[in-house]
Amino acid sequence: MKLGKVEFCHFLQLIALFLCFSGMSQAELSRSRSKPYFQSGRSRTKRSWVWNQFFVLEEYMGSDPLYVGKLHSDVDKGDGSIKYILSGEGASSIFIIDENTGDIHATKRLDREEQAYYTLRAQALDRLTNKPVEPESEFVIKIQDINDNEPKFLDGPYTAGVPEMSPVGTSVVQVTATDADDPTYGNSARVVYSILQGQPYFSVEPKTGVIKTALPNMDREAKDQYLLVIQAKDMVGQNGGLSGTTSVTVTLTDVNDNPPRFPRRSYQYNVPESLPVASVVARIKAADADIGANAEMEYKIVDGDGLGIFKISVDKETQEGIITIQKELDFEAKTSYTLRIEAANKDADPRFLSLGPFSDTTTVKIIVEDVDEPPVFSSPLYPMEVSEATQVGNIIGTVAAHDPDSSNSPVRYSIDRNTDLERYFNIDANSGVITTAKSLDRETNAIHNITVLAMESQNPSQVGRGYVAITILDINDNAPEFAMDYETTVCENAQPGQVIQKISAVDKDEPSNGHQFYFSLTTDATNNHNFSLKDNKDNTASILTRRNGFRRQEQSVYYLPIFIVDSGSPSLSSTNTLTIRVCDCDADGVAQTCNAEAYVLPAGLSTGALIAILACVLTLLVLILLIVTMRRRKKEPLIFDEERDIRENIVRYDDEGGGEEDTEAFDMAALRNLNVIRDTKTRRDVTPEIQFLSRPAFKSIPDNVIFREFIWERLKEADVDPGAPPYDSLQTYAFEGNGSVAESLSSLDSISSNSDQNYDYLSDWGPRFKRLADMYGTGQESLYS
């Protein structure tokens, strides 16, 4: 017969009660009180409480209140005169007392894990007087534990790690289960551990919960993780005990127990010879089953003919060996290289050296492929020299380039004109001879840096570049001149022999031995009585006065011509003029005032020449002003003089209609007399938008005013006339002269069907008027009807 959990708990309760009551010596204890109790004021009687030791089983599930124990006083005679009351923790709510008998019962289910004991107070009262017959006494009701809580792993699930290849018995992790039952009573809280899943790899200590390895040489590379299930069971693991489980994930951590190995014994790679230095040729990798730091590699080239051409480094992320170029490759020099490369772990574990050497080697063969390379010059830079006096077409030097490929294609030369914009030089396309194409000037450009292009004849896209530095050698082709525009002063009170100016010269040429200049006065100025020149022999000269008594009123400016010769071969010379102004000076020789009248020494311009130049300049200015004035002159407005008549003249005017053929003279008096044109013709069936005021009488006014008034009147008539042009209508004009024989061709005349005009005569005027005759001749009337 199987018992359920509830029945099993009741069974345990009965056993516990039996043990409790059998262990008591008749279960009742008497306690004498030394405290006296007074009755009726004078007599003293000793009283004492008597009660059971109270124990209550937890988790009582019965329908009736659970009997706890009985309170009894020596005073109680059993006649009902004593009343018992209960106070303290759980009184009335959990625990009740029979006031007549003193029996205590529990009315609710108790849980020791919530509260292990209750402290209460009991008192016996006289039922009639309701006064205490015994002092209040405190007692404890202890909750008796039963095995109603299973062990629990409060820290689970667990994760742990252990190095692979660990020996048997290596500690992995400790698990701990707790049981809420009373550890001081029975075996309800005594837990033992066992492993339900994870054997035969791991084991667990039953009492401590320490998990250990159970198999040797567990290999992470074969299996790196294990899931264990650990059980904790109370009642020392006996049947009927409660249990709890947890999971433990054990990861094998890596150790360096696998040496690196290349997947292949040899590798081969093809690279073009044009691959730049530092380019990657190949990547190789030695396999290592380990991970992390145990798989870190070191690569090196241990042998081969490419030790100085290639190098190998390691990629920290992928642990690959990277082979790169250290020097330029040349197919024509060497077509292949062989490298012996070793890979080794950075840190080897001495415990596993017996597994073999923790390094491996492989062979890498690198094949250099030929590419079509541009021509190569024999020198990276060609320095050349040429005199600036050399003739056009002279040879300066020669450059040479060749095709480095095995085909050795012929080379053609040219100059990169971006480096020779002025085209000073030419080059022979076949020989590479450089010649001058223009005259050279060192003072303009002393060094020409040009780029020569060399192209293969068979493949012009392959271009090599050579650099030529042409230095222009100097010749004496520039005359010396003043270092600056000199202008000095001489005081009126200057003494003879006084130095008034020190001059120097410059020369654009650069002789190898330096400049040497010679100064003197020109032949015309040598015999002047005012100034002299002293050559200081150090490329300078001093100007001195020959006399005293200079007067500004007599001569305010002197022009002294100075002759300068250089030391070149052949030597060159120039004449430069020094301006000397006569000034009024103070006592210290500082100039105060000077004027600008000039007295020219024999070597300068004459006074007559200066006057002639000034006259020419003045005449030119007058002509320019006259031209500007003529161009800016505006036309005067047209004003008719009353005494002037324009008859017998052709008058040009604008007309929006057809032109008038009548050029016969007419009388201006008709226009001047405005009385004949004052009747404003307005349409009676249309109310004009502009109401005209009464016009005053007109006086005699100028002709231009007459024309303006006439046009203004006609403009107002047109503004108020809805039938005004662009519609054809009859217009009234002032007298314009007598009619011509050919009659008028004005477009303003009516060509309606009511017109009596006849244009048949136009056909008699010849072919020039044929088109006009077709438009206005016979038969046209129907077109306009």
From Swiss-Prot:
Q: Which residues cross the membrane?
A: 608-628
Leader sequence segment:
1-27
The record's Gene Ontology biological-process terms are: adherens junction organization; calcium-dependent cell-cell adhesion via plasma membrane cell adhesion molecules; cell migration; cell morphogenesis; cell-cell adhesion; cell-cell adhesion mediated by cadherin; cell-cell junction assembly; homophilic cell adhesion via plasma membrane adhesion molecules
Extracellular compartment segments? 28-607
SMART domains cross-referenced by the UniProt entry: CA
- Where does the record say carbohydrate is attached? N449, N530
Query: Ranges in the Cytoplasmic compartment?
Result: 629-785
What GO cellular component entries does it have? adherens junction; catenin complex; plasma membrane
Identify its membrane topology class.
Single-pass type I membrane protein
Report the main location listed first in the record: membrane
Q: What does this protein do?
A: Cadherins are calcium-dependent cell adhesion proteins. They preferentially interact with themselves in a homophilic manner in connecting cells; cadherins may thus contribute to the sorting of heterogeneous cell types.
The protein's name in its UniProt record = Cadherin-7
Report the gene name.
CDH7
